A protein has these predicted regions:
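Short, cysteine-centered beta-strand-loop-beta hairpins and adjacent loop/turn segments enriched
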Residues: 83-100, 248-256
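A short, structured loop/turn motif at beta-sheet edges
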Residues: 66-78, 107-117
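A short, surface-exposed interaction/processing loop segment used at functional sites
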Residues: 101-131, 247-270
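A short hydrophobic beta-strand element
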Residues: 73-89, 238-244
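N-terminal "first-domain core" detector
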Residues: 4, 8-69
């Protein structure tokens, strides 16, 4: 039985740059390190897997290694792992996607240079199959740990927070780091108009980058940081106006759209 298994044929972890590397395909970055020990290999594998959580600025991870087994040049690591993906929202470097504490088994091969290569990344199945799949993945002696993996989450979240803080230090940015949801200011429009707005966001590449709240989010595109802003004002006739902007860090406007609320729909006026 295959249990939430991901196979990686050519995924070796070698030293790159001292600064975080931007992955152009998914616009998420993390600091890659030379994986010549299982601790680093596990960390890198979780962050690589974190790319599946979507386009964001920086990937962090937290993990606890319960045990390892080695047979020949193969190493299996029994872990509890968590992914945390961050971006700037309203000036706060906040977690926007990721996972809880997930019992995870990783298998690596070790090449002639001592580099670890990820072969398989196993997570338990969801729903009713969750417990049974964990029992198939882990030795029975770890049942008391992996069946209550959520008890490790605070520890894993602290690891993610430290990595996020280190990333900000590396890019020379001073900002608050939040590992929990940050309350947003919603648009002051009707439910029907908001639903129409959300449908628009999902169908337009520019709008899709804009916040669905009154505020800002930052996106790195081809190595350049842009600020997307959603704001609301009143027209001279009293109608609500929603303005969406894409700006450089210095405030230079690259793109802008304005919509007026009419009959619970957004009508473009600029």
């Amino acid at each position: 039985m295959i249990i939430g298994m991901f196979f990686y044929g050519e995924n070796d972890f070698k030293a790159k740059d001292a600064m975080p590397i931007l992955d152009e395909s998914v616009s998420s970055s993390y600091e890659r390190k030379d994986a010549t020990n299982v601790e680093t290999a596990v960390s890198e594998a979780i962050k690589e897997h974190g790319k599946t959580y979507g386009k964001r600025e920086y990937i962090t991870e937290g993990h606890v290694i319960l045990d390892t087994e080695q047979k020949g040049n193969k190493v299996k690591a029994y872990t509890i792992a968590s992914v945390g993906v961050f971006e700037f929202q309203d000036g706060i470097f906040t977690i926007v996607s990721g996972s809880g504490a997930i019992p995870t088994v990783m298998t690596f091969s070790i090449d002639e240079h001592g580099q670890y290569k990820l072969i398989a990344y196993e997570e338990p199945l969801d729903g009713e199959a969750y417990v049974e799949s964990i029992k198939k993945m882990f030795p029975k002696k770890y049942d008391s740990k992996v069946l209550y993996a959520e008890e490790y989450y605070d520890e894993l979240a602290k690891q993610q927070e430290r990595q996020a803080q280190e990333y900000l230090k590396n890019i020379g940015r001073h900002a608050k780091v939040s590992i929990s949801y940050v309350e947003k200011q919603p648009l002051n429009i009707s439910v029907q108009a908001m639903n129409h707005f959300l449908r628009m966001l999902s169908s337009d590449p520019f709008l899709n980058e804009c916040p669905d709240w009154l505020g800002t989010r930052e996106v790195i595109e081809q190595g350049i940081r842009y600020v997307y802003e959603t704001s609301q004002s009143k027209a001279n006739d009293g109608r609500d106006v929603v303005t969406l902007r894409k700006m450089k860090e210095d405030g230079t406007v690259i793109d802008m759209r304005q919509y007026v609320i009419e009959e619970n729909k957004l009508k473009r006026i600029k």
